[in-house]
């Protein structure tokens, strides 16, 4: 049986810092970001199913979110303003991401490739699944801004404003629910979020 370097590569996602051009009170890496996006995407899918007559596989969406930035272990994390500077750059970067996704799949033993291709390759996801993961990704970036601003880091002021516009564009009932019920807590201290539920 041949060795595979797939999971050794994925373990290096923790070495890739997000927000590399900005001063951070606390550095965030791609691995922890991916887990948070999985938490939020799963929640959005559950909210849609329970509150807004959705019919999504919330567990699959959590997995898609968990792997949504996996290709960055080969490409690195390109800052959003550069990645989307114009349509041509965005298009070319998408092609690079696609190649990286395929390279990751090819690292796996052949008998596992199709299972992971379904998670790594965007062409195997529905428009609705992609939309939920994109909403969660934008929400998590927004939450990072709130945390940095709460810690006194004004560096994230413009990023927060930009992400508010992005969230408006990706608006959905489930996102509104999440924003109303869960987001306000991210601006509170540990003592404030622990008051109602002491151990």
UniProtKB/Swiss-Prot annotation:
Cofactors, names only: a divalent metal cation
Enzyme nomenclature, EC number: 3.1.3.89
GO molecular function: 5'-deoxynucleotidase activity; metal ion binding; nucleotide binding
SMART domains linked to this entry: HDc (SM00471)
Residues annotated as domain HD: 30-142
Entries under Pfam families matching the protein: YfbR-like
HAMAP family: 5DNU
Family the entry assigns: Belongs to the 5DNU family.
UniProt protein name: 5'-deoxynucleotidase PC1_2775
Organism: Pectobacterium carotovorum subsp. carotovorum (strain PC1)
